[in-house]
Amino acid sequence: MPRYAYRLRIKPDCIEEYEREHKRVWPELLAKLKEVGISDYSIFRRGQDLMLVFRLDDFDKAMDEMGRDPVNQRWQVSMGRLFEPVPDVQPGERFSMWKEVFFLE
């Protein structure tokens, strides 16, 4: 199963709130993430930068389904105000995706 990684950036004054909210992610959102096939999902933080890593068979299909989900829409609104633009996101891209160049299982 493919692994994906991308970067987000938190506003400096929102780091504590971001971490607090991720200690209590809504159960309905967790269920939806699993339903669309996301697994082994981790979020790492260094300063303002977040690295999100997960496994997923069909990225575009899952992101489209998550985008239509009302629970996810509410979560995105509540979290969206915590972020700054990521400098390396290109026009037309949703995320600053990273290419996996090595993996040891």
Question: Which residues make up each language-model segment?
Answer:
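Short, glycine- and small/hydrophobic-rich beta-strand elements in well-ordered beta-sheets
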Residues: 30-51, 55-59
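Active-site-flanking beta-strand signature of metal-NTP-handling nucleotidyl enzymes
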Residues: 4-9
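An amphipathic, aromatic/His-enriched active-site/gating alpha helix that lines ligand/cofactor pockets
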Residues: 36, 57-94
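Ligand/cofactor pocket segment of small-molecule handling proteins
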Residues: 1
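Short amphipathic alpha-helical segments
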Residues: 14-38
